[in-house]
């Protein structure tokens, strides 16, 4: 019997642990990526073949390439390692008729298109900020008259806070829509809901959430992305009532959206105005910015590795979570003024990971108590802001 073959869409340099786990489980691993990424430090020992193309984002070219290669290489699973790969991977699954082994194009929209996300969440009884599509002028005018500002004009398919504009008047909203031109229809407008932003990092098996870790951002990502500053997130104390409430909403989203099997990073806002939880966005992938490293040191679960196991056992075999730890961890990350910042003065024993990326500084810390994690993050954020932090204007698109 031939080994199971995994085709991984890799539009960004990430997911090495996923590929290594697939290989360790005996799979044949194909990594499909843009030409410019083939020289990155991939775990080539775990990749049977790198398929690199200069036309990675052209759907017909991708299908032609994979169809030709598929004459001699069977593809049993098609996986998207990054947010921007989700739609193309779904398109390929539809083409190869593997929609029973991952998201098809309709369900993939719920994990990429913020307008589709909100409509679906609302239909299954999950609270969302007030929103409107940008297709019809009269609907927009009605929305702006009915819903108090400020408002956010958001790209429907960008990741994180890229491209979001905060508008304080209806005039600003219309000006932003005019600036978008033909891209206007690929945006939405929603009310700004001030609050505390949480993210849930999950694993799903057979349509049910089997692992969910609730984490809290230091401040909303929009504030960090557009105002500069230092990014931080941490394990939220597991005995707090917010954790149970957010897990309930998270399960509604992932099970209602039809993820089926895999990993997810989902965000909720606890609103200052009413204490209720509002769904912000979800995804069908592992969170970025060292989130997976943080979760692993807090729980013992490596999201990339466990996601690989879940993909492998879709049609046969049983999946079991590894033993869980009950520790706490946090991440702090910032752009740096220095190309290679000297972090030797950060010497606390709780540091379990140091970011190695030009013009960036970052750490993952882990401890037995949430108080110690918060103490370290607060100290590091202050030092980084003072001695290292660099601020660039917020971009309209995420740059890989």
Predicted regions: what they are:
Residues 94-163:
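A conserved helix-loop-beta module that forms one wall/lid of the active-site cleft
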Residues 171, 191-259, 263, 270, ...:
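ATP-dependent carboxylate/phosphate-activation module, predominantly the ATP-grasp catalytic core
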Residues 127-129, 150-153, 162-199, 226-232, ...:
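Conserved ATP-binding module of the ATP-grasp superfamily
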Residues 61, 139-143, 172:
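Short acidic active-site motifs
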Residues 5, 15, 140, 306-400:
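Peripheral (often C-terminal) accessory segments that flank ATP-dependent C-N-forming ligase machineries
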Residues 134, 164-169, 203-205, 365-366:
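Short beta-strand-to-turn element immediately C-terminal to the catalytic PLP-Schiff-base lysine
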Residues 1-105, 138, 369-370, 378-398:
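ATP-binding N-terminal substructure of ATP-dependent carboxylate-amine bond-forming enzymes
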Residues 68-75, 145-147, 181-183:
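Glycine-rich phosphate-binding loop signature in dinucleotide/nucleotide-binding domains
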């Amino acid at each position: 019997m031939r080994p199971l073959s995994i085709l991984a869409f890799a539009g960004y340099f990430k997911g090495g642990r996923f590929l290594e786990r697939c290989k360790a489980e005996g799979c044949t691993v194909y990594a499909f990526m843009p030409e410019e990424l083939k020289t990155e430090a991939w775990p080539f020992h775990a990749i049977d073949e790198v398929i690199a193309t200069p036309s990675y984002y052209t759907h017909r070219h991708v299908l032609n390439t994979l169809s030709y290669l598929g004459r001699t290489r069977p593809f049993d699973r098609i996986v998207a390692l990054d947010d921007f790969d989700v739609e193309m991977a779904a398109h390929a699954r539809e083409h190869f008729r593997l929609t029973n082994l991952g998201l098809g194009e309709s369900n993939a929209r719920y994990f990429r298109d913020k307008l589709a996300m909100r409509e679906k969440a609302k239909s299954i009884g999950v609270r969302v900020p007030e929103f409107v599509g940008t297709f019809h002028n009269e609907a927009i005018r009605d929305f702006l008259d009915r819903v108090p500002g400020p408002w956010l004009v958001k790209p429907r398919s960008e990741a994180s806070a890229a491209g979001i504009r905060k508008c304080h008047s209806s005039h600003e909203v219309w000006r932003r829509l005019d600036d978008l031109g033909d891209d206007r229809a690929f945006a939405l407008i929603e009310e700004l809901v001030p609050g505390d932003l949480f993210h849930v990092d999950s694993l799903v098996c057979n349509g049910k959430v089997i692992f969910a870790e609730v984490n809290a951002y230091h401040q909303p990502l929009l504030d960090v992305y557009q105002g500069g500053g230092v990014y931080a997130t941490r394990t939220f104390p597991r005995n707090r009532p917010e954790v149970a409430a957010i897990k309930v909403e998270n399960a509604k989203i992932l099970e209602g959206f039809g993820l089926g099997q895999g990993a997810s990073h989902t965000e909720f806002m606890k609103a200052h105005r009413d204490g209720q939880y509002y769904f912000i966005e979800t995804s069908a992938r592992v969170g970025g910015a060292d989130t997976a490293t943080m979760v692993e040191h807090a729980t013992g679960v490596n999201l990339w590795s466990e996601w690989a196991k879940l993909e492998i056992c879709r049609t046969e075999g049983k999946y079991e979570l590894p033993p869980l730890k009950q520790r706490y961890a946090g991440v702090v990350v910032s752009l740096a003024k220095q190309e290679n910042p000297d972090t030797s003065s950060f010497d606390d024993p709780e540091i379990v990971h140091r970011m190695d990326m030009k013009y960036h500084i970052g750490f993952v810390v882990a401890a037995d108590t949430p108080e110690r994690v918060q103490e370290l993050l607060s100290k590091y954020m202050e030092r980084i802001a003072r001695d290292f932090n660099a601020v660039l204007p917020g971009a309209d698109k995420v740059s890989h």
